[in-house]
Amino acid sequence: EESITDDTVMISIMMANNEIGTIADVKSIGEIAHKHNVIFHTDAAQAVGHIPVDVEEMSIDLMSFSAHKMYGPKGVGALYVRGVKPRVKPDGLFYGGGQERNIRSGTLNVPGIVGFGKAMEISQKEMDTENKRFSEWSGIMLEEFEKIGGVLNGHRSKRLSHNLNVYFPGIEGKSIINSVSKEIAISAGSACTTQNVEPSHVLLALGMDEDTTHYAIRIGLGRLNTLEELNFLIKTISNTINSLKTLSSNI
């Protein structure tokens, strides 16, 4: 709230972080924005379809989200725009046929839109069941990784159930990834920055030093994963960590 000035037009916040899974207190931020007559936007790509979202309850004026984050087709997204109290009227990106309420002219991606709608329908139906399963599985993973020195990055409870970001002190995340890459797909950061060797700005913001940020790995659980695969992942990563620790101690 202290960052708001007379020149502040809009506040934009990520609802759920794609790297560590932490869920922001969007409701409180939205209330602060409206208290100061500032438009409130949230990037909810990681959240919609995975956690309950209520634009009225959360005081959201603008919300962007994507189909592929909920198993829909790539290349299609949506922008919620508040129509009243306050009415928000975005300027068009470009002009032509006037589609998308003159915000984004051009022929509509009908197959993508239909696929998006179906993905949303399925996600809403499966949300509670999936969150329960993923919460249990994430808890199992974290418990096992903590036994071998793993440390959780992010909030312990206010996070996406399918996202787990941990680090193992002294062991490079890239070394872990390279060791398991033929059997398991995990990453050292967000999918947007997998080729970036720079330290994660998200982890730096948590107060971690640059060296420690390079120890992190990110694991994502999916709808099609099985308990057998989870157990295989835990065993494989745990064995890899122990092997890398032994190798490091012998150098």
PLM features per residue range, with description:
Residues 1-251:
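Pyridoxal 5′-phosphate
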